[in-house]
Amino acid sequence: RSDDLAISERHHGLVPSNERGRSQTHIDRMARLHRDAVELPEQRTHPASATAPPAVVSASPADHRETDRVRIAYASDSAFGFYYAGDLEALQAAAAELVPFSPLRDRDLPACDGLFLGGGFPETHMDGLEQNSSMRAAVAAFIERGGAVYAECGGLMYLADSLTWEGKTRKMAGVIPAEVVMHPKPQGRGYVRLRETAAHPWPLSGDGSEAISAHEFHYSALRQVPEGLDFAYRVERGQGLDGVHDGIVYRNLLASYAHLRDTRSHPWAKRFVDFVRRCRVA
């Protein structure tokens, strides 16, 4: 056993690499220890018998006309970093140019046609998120102008009025009229099954006939949620926002606890890019 191999943990599991800052150094250390302790030539003489599944070939961004292309800014810093690489690639294949930005450090949004606010740990960075009032205002203004925005879990939390954790409350973007409160135990964890409603801004089926498979893992829950909100999903399995609904819809924003995965049966990335294209704002 070596303490050099330990990886920090907290309420959601391992501390993600976008927060550690020295992840590559840690990986290099593990590689050296493995090289010194394991007979690699012996391993090479016994290759695994299983073969990798065939890769899914997507259209290249170069296959699209320049007029089809859109710029999607996505939150990427130590507070927000949960994205599937395959989903980002699917967005690019659908003619999206992805532009990272930091809700913690940047003062304004980059020039963009749409926003993708992914998962992360806004609760551990809520002081910095509150202090960056210019970015919170920029995100809120983009949504109010009708910009297309997709937010998952941590992104949803950032868009609420406030975030409370360990007895402290900090202001967030103030787009979703509700408070987010962290709890000691998970409020939603595992696979979810959803049905789209007529309010979904970029639906798969439009009539709710297709079940949407996704997953959730959140210690937070919404409080003081007003009546009359529109929801994109009915929850058939899982928790979502309240055990019945998920996916708050406001203007051209969809914000949910569910994490989608772009697949053949549920190609959400292209549908979102098409929606961004239809909603371009000046």
Question: Could you describe each region identified by the protein language model?
Answer:
Residues 1-64:
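Internal gly/pro-rich beta-alpha loop/helix module
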Residues 1-5, 76-78, 218:
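G-domain G4 guanine-recognition motif of GTPases
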Residues 6-13, 85-87, 127, 161-162, ...:
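Short acidic, glycine/serine/threonine-rich loops at helix termini
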Residues 31-34, 75-78, 257-260:
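Structural motif
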Residues 67-68, 80-99, 110, 182, ...:
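C-terminal and late-domain segments of enzyme folds
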Residues 68-133, 137-144:
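Phosphate-binding active sites in nucleotide-utilizing proteins
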Residues 115, 152, 173-176, 217, ...:
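Hydrophobic, well-ordered secondary-structure elements that form the walls
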Residues 122-201:
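Cysteine-nucleophile active-site neighborhood
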